[in-house]
Every structure is written in C-alpha cells, then in structure tokens.
Amino acid sequence: MSQPLNADQELVSDVVACQLVIKQILDVLDVIAPVEVREKMSSQLKNIDFTNHPAAADPVTMRAIQKAIALIELKFTPQGESH
C-alpha cells in the first residue's frame, strides 16, 4: 500500500472485511445447516422487542439488526421465492 488510510477509510475497510467474513460464514451455513436453523437465525433477530431493548436507543445498532435480518433472509431465500 502506498499511502496510509485515514480514519474513515480504515472504518470502511473494517466494515468491508466484516462483510466478507460474514458472507463466507453464510455460505458455509447454507451448505451445512438445515432450513430450520437458518430460519431460526432471522426469527431470533425479528423477535427482539425494540420497545424494551437497549438497541432501540441506538439507531445505528437498530439499523444493523434490520440489515442482518435482510441479509440472512436474502441469502437463504431460494431464487424462485425472492421478490
């Protein structure tokens, strides 16, 4: 690397690195986990009661949970079922 990254660039690279690791984990789960396990992953997140959960006070965490649900559902939705 020719130039050091600034703080924002480092943060973005951290996020991208996490996304890549998550994609690899989801790919493995897609192969080894039964459908029930994959459904439970998103249902656990969907069942968070944001009226009492501390994440409700933090819009970044709340949005991250919403994105996690969407990613899990998108990853494991068969192509014919996607909208």
UniProtKB/Swiss-Prot annotation:
Pfam families: DUF2766 (PF10964). This is Uncharacterized protein YecJ. It comes from Escherichia coli (strain K12).
